[in-house]
A protein has these predicted regions:
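Terminal peptide-recognition signature
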Residues: 148
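G-domain G4 guanine-recognition motif of GTPases
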Residues: 151
């Protein structure tokens, strides 16, 4: 087996650091807290090394609690639907002028963490005006209507696909994606090379009909993409005047 290499540490120092892990295994510390204590303050030294810890310490390594997933939410009293938003600026704009009946959740592009959504270790930070108890009761309800809105690119579609593992009813939010699609179809998008998106991979199918039949074909045909900050969602009653 290939020996672990950590820049700045000699092989002997690496062995010593791993040997120092054991006393911390039953102290309810996260992997990054343990790493910072054993590897000269480097909290990421043990990232992606859980299998090695299992070989060294067996089931003791399984006592390390998962790192909590911290999410920001705005959940007005009486909401009935959930909208997950990929990017911070767009999330905060929607909080200022929220779509009717929706709670909003800022995902922060957590593609790699999507499978942890339903974990007991997930934590929420609620913006003022929220009803935290109602949100916690309803947000993973498989009967509740839920949507995702993010960048119109393969990575964004991949996030939607991953989120559907925890939220099977999740659909792309058409009020957000439709105006983006119109821009994309009129050559208003950017090339993947412009924003270093060439490494993004096509997710294939997501299980969301609108995504699979409309959004993904447009991305493939135009070979361009559009970040969600490019558009502004008008307030629910914009343009409506009282008689």
């Amino acid at each position: 087996n290939q020996k672990p290499q950590i820049p700045g540490l000699t092989p002997a120092e690496i062995v010593n650091a791993f040997a120092n892990v054991e006393p911390y295994l039953n102290q309810n510390l996260t992997l990054r807290e343990i790493a910072a204590r054993c590897f000269n303050g480097d909290s990421k030294a043990l990232d992606n090394r859980h299998e090695l810890l299992l070989k060294l310490y067996g089931d003791k390594a399984n006592t390390i609690p998962p790192r909590p997933l911290l999410l920001t939410a705005w959940a007005p009293p009486g909401f009935t639907k959930l909208l997950i938003v990929e990017n911070q600026d767009s999330f905060l704009r929607l909080v200022e002028a929220p779509p009717e009946d929706y709670a909003l959740l800022y995902s922060g592009g957590f593609r790699a963490s999507a499978t942890r959504l339903s974990s007991e270790h997930t934590r929420f930070a609620f913006l003022p005006g929220s009803d935290p108890e109602r949100f916690k009761q309803r947000w993973l309800d498989e009967q509740a209507e839920c949507h995702f809105w993010g960048d119109l690119d393969f990575a964004g579609m991949g996030i939607l696909k991953a989120l559907r593992n925890s939220l099977p009813n999740l659909q792309a939010w058409q009020p957000g994606y439709q105006p983006m699609l119109e821009i994309l179809n009129t050559r208003g998008g950017h090339a993947p090379q412009q924003t270093r998106k060439t490494a993004q991979t096509d997710p294939g199918t997501t299980g969301c009909p609108y995504t699979d039949t409309t959004l993904l074909p447009a991305l493939r045909q135009t070979n361009t993409a559009l970040d969600q900050e490019a558009i502004h969602i008008p307030p629910p009653n914009a343009g409506i005047t009282n008689p």
